[in-house]
UniProtKB/Swiss-Prot annotation:
Phosphothreonine modifications at: T195, T502
Segments forming domain OTU: 213-336
Region (His-loop) residue spans: 324-329
Keyword Transferase: no
Record-level GO cellular component terms: nucleus
Entry similarity comment: Belongs to the peptidase C85 family.
Catalyzed chemical reaction(s): Thiol-dependent hydrolysis of ester, thioester, amide, peptide and isopeptide bonds formed by the C-terminal Gly of ubiquitin (a 76-residue protein attached to proteins as an intracellular targeting signal)
Pfam families according to UniProt: OTU
Species annotation: Mus musculus (Mouse)
GO biological process, one term: neural crest cell differentiation
Phosphoserine PTM sites in chain numbering: S64, S165, S177, S323, S332, S370, S447, S503
Region: Cys-loop, residue numbers: 218-224
The protein's name in its UniProt record: OTU domain-containing protein 5
Length: 566
């Protein structure tokens, strides 16, 4: 078999469709063609390929993803983007699908502008016909958008007869997202910041007003897709590493199915995707939809999802919602009125939002108990203040009552003495009463409770038990005064001679008997337990001294005989 030399690359303005097909056979067999790719990728067909319609030799650019759903054609047909194989042709490997291909619905955008529907190519050679099945579809790079395919950068020349050139092989064998970063950066630079901001604001407002959804911003570090899914499943975007690890493990366990959608080596693809800064695409979305058994809805500047990925089993679980911004970044779309955290983790008897409701009930119960305890404490404080106020009022009433009783006793004593009482004795009694009143006021101010309990007229039981009347101030002073050394056996305190019957103390003996009786009583009955002994003695001695001097003067007057005038 003769191998012709490579054909020189045509100039950029040349039309490949007008070039005549070169003579010679095609290579006997291409390298393994990857299946219809959803994660973005090249055709993956090794040798030169011929388009039956155009007659152009060379690799075809990637095509958009096929629509999901029933396709026209007889039963058993591969897909509408696969052409019929001529009789006698040898068909290439056919992907075995275990679940629906991870692609959008018929209504979703299938590819970017200028993308054409892919088709299998048939090359006719001298030794036979070889068909390579699987012109793969690119849906974006590591952060490629949903439904947007990215064309692979190709060499200036087109593959010639006899197989692809080394330059072509080097460019065509790249991984699915080789043009992600340069193309995304170029698109972002070409956008007007004001327009982008206005569009983002409209998108967020439309979702909130029409659907009630809220867009949660994810960190732009290359793991935005996994962060958005982690926020939906675990409620914490920082668990994106766990989501990525589970997703990659799931892809490896189902490599026989997902490898048909990747043009590069599947192990190399998985190892690259395990890096935390590598973005995700539709392959990972389909894997996570199956892994968590929840649909994945993608929103892009619309209130309706532009793409939905379904799991193997249909259920009523809330879908995982993500939003796609500027063709390079994913955010999480949450429904604040319906809890979805924990759904899809396989937890038995798990009810979304039940934990929050339980915590809320416990918080309300604790708050109510704390409020009740606080109110009880306030009630106790108010009751204590009320009791203290009542006690103060009672003490004040008792004090005023006792002072009034003292005034009444003094008034009665004045009425009993009558106008014949000497002024000096009246002054002495008044001074004694004033001293007693001042002493009593001082005593009541120091110990009102004990005074009221012992000497107040509110306690008649004590006086009735002892068989005595409440002592008057004069009587108290008289009892405390020691007997006068000059008093013979009978003496008068306030008047002399004929006024003995009107005196409170007629003789010393009743006073001594009363004094002995009082000494047998407890001092607390008179409220004397809080008095200072020195002050009492000083007051009593002063009054006694004054009365003693007065009595001495009176006795001297009575004893001196009148001078004999004869």
């Amino acid at each position: 078999m003769t191998i012709l030399p490579k054909k020189k690359p045509p100039p950029p303005d040349a039309d490949p469709a007008n070039e005549p097909p070169p003579p010679g056979p095609l290579p006997p067999a291409p390298r393994r063609g990857a299946g219809v790719g959803v994660g973005g990728g090249g055709t993956g067909v090794g040798g030169g390929e011929r388009d039956r319609d155009s007659g152009v030799v060379g690799a075809r650019p990637r095509a958009s993803p096929p629509p999901q759903g029933p396709l026209p054609g007889p039963p058993g047909a591969l897909h509408r983007w696969a052409l019929a194989v001529p009789p006698g042709a040898v068909a290439g490997p056919r992907p075995q699908q275990a679940s629906p291909p991870p692609c959008g619905g018929p209504g979703g955008p299938g590819g970017g502008p200028g993308d054409a529907l892919g088709a299998t190519t048939a090359g006719v050679g001298a030794a036979g016909v070889v068909v390579g099945v699987g012109g793969t579809v690119g849906v974006g790079g590591c952060c490629s958008g949903p439904g947007h395919s990215k064309r692979r950068r190709q060499a200036p020349g087109v593959g010639a007869v006899g197989g692809a050139s080394p330059e072509r092989e080097e460019v065509g064998a790249g991984y699915n997202s080789e043009d992600e970063y340069e193309a995304a950066a170029a698109r972002i630079e070409a956008m007007d910041p004001a327009t982008v901001e206005q569009q983002e604001h409209w998108f967020e407002k439309a979702l909130r007003d029409k659907k009630g959804f809220i867009i949660k911003q994810m960190k732009e570090d290359g793991a935005c897709l996994f962060r958005a899914v982690a926020d939906q499943v675990y409620g914490d975007q920082d668990m994106h590493e766990v989501v990525r690890k589970h997703c990659m493990d799931y892809l490896m366990k189902n490599a026989d199915y997902f490898s048909n959608y990747v043009t590069e080596d599947f192990t190399t693809y998985i190892n690259r995707k395990r890096k935390n800064n590598c973005h995700g695409n539709h392959i990972e979305m389909q894997a996570m939809a199956e892994m968590y058994n929840r649909p994945v809805e993608v929103y892009q500047y619309s209130t309706e999802p532009i793409n939905t990925f379904h799991g193997i089993h249909q259920n009523e679980d809330e879908p995982i919602r993500v939003s796609y911004h500027r063709n390079i970044h994913y955010n999480s779309v949450v429904n604040p009125n319906k809890a979805t955290i924990g759904v899809g983790l396989g937890l038995p008897s798990f009810k979304p939002g039940f934990a929050e409701q339980s915590l809320m009930k416990n918080a309300i119960k604790t708050s109510e108990e704390s409020w009740i305890e606080q109110q009880m404490l306030e009630d106790k404080k108010r009751a204590t203040d009320w009791e203290a106020t009542n006690e103060a009022i009672e003490e004040q009433v008792a004090r005023e009552s006792y002072l009034q009783w003292l005034r009444d006793q003094e008034k009665q004593a004045r009425q009993v003495r009558g106008p014949s009482q000497p002024r000096k004795a009246s002054a002495t009694c008044s001074s004694a009463t004033a001293a007693a009143s001042s002493g009593l006021e001082e005593w009541t101010s120091r110990s009102p409770r004990q005074r009221s309990s012992a000497s107040s007229p509110e306690h008649p039981e004590l006086h009735a038990e002892l068989g005595i009347k409440p002592p008057s101030p004069g009587t108290v002073l008289a009892l405390a005064k020691p007997p006068s050394p000059c008093a013979p056996g009978t003496s008068s305190q306030f008047s002399a001679g004929g006024d003995r019957a009107t005196s409170p103390l007629v003789s010393l003996y009743p006073a001594l008997e009363c004094r002995a009786l009082i000494q047998q009583m407890s001092p607390s009955a008179f409220g004397l337990n809080d008095w200072d002994d020195d002050e009492i003695l000083a007051s009593v001695l002063a009054v006694s001294q004054q009365e003693y001097l007065d009595s001495m003067k009176k006795n001297k007057v009575h004893r001196e005989p009148p001078p004999d005038k004869s």
